[in-house]
Amino acid sequence: MQQAARAAAALPPRAHCLLACGSPAPLATRLQTCWGVTAPPRARRLSTAEGRGLEAGASCDDPTRVRTNVFKAAIRPSPEQRRQIGLWTGLRSTMVAEMISHVSGLDWFVIDMEHGPNELGDVLLQLQASQRGRAEPVVRVPWNEPVAVKRVLDLGAQSIIFPWVNTAAEAQQAVEATRYPGLGGVRGVMSLARMNNYGAANPGYYQEAAEQICNIVQIETVKAVENIEEIAAVDGVDALFIGPSDLSASMGHIGKPQHPEVKACIAEAFKRIAATGKASGFLTANHDDCKWALTLGCNFVAVGSDMQMLTAATKAAAADFHAYCQML
């Protein structure tokens, strides 16, 4: 023991860092021991809501609280509402999700499981990349089916689009998939998952989860349009989202979402949704139609998709430079 102590005393001062690094002492203490410096105070990370410049209901970093869904509150109709601008995504890319959420300036974006190639693991990675950013990730599930919804919710998704909802009964089925038994639903209970911080001191999750889940049902057929008031009356439905492509097909104008009859139907649908007090959503790559929808009172719009924008920009660049090269 005495020989070991003498050997340690003979070490150069900085070499004691190797001994201190194995110590269970706090990092600040080890820095002082090794290098004679004082660690700076640890900065507090902002919650998602604070990062958006909005009032924070609960920090993302607090494992005892359910993450506040700022998007759910932001789409609620009101005279002061700031319309929410978003984008559809189907490239199955965590980098796209991160870019949109952190630097694009958009308010929301869709991770599409119905028509996109996203599987459950892809959704998880995109949620992890985006949920601390500004834009809310909204997952469109492949179908209005409780198992698919349960698995997405367990990953931590809080905003869900349900495709092909035609009746109040189907809207009720969608809502029940997001709520636990005894609280109006059939959602399966999982105690250790991402949605409740892996069970970390969050006993209120099961009671509070539904308050922060945003349920968006898609209106994509003539039948759904006929049932707008009944669908909107279902408790737990937060928004009705008009899908112009499927709606035009349902009306006999497949591939022609700008047909006058289709646009007249959509305009009437916006008016009726507004009368119910629920939010309305819309998707189109045509920016004039996006502005038209906003003028009609639409509360949140997707102004295109990642694939569509990449394709259009690539084709435009190729045409521009091929034309330029012909002039050389």
Q: Predicted segment positions?
A:
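Expand to "…catalyze enediolate/carbanion chemistry for C-C bond making/breaking, isomerization
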Residues: 8, 18, 40-328
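N-terminal chloroplast transit peptides
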Residues: 1-30, 34
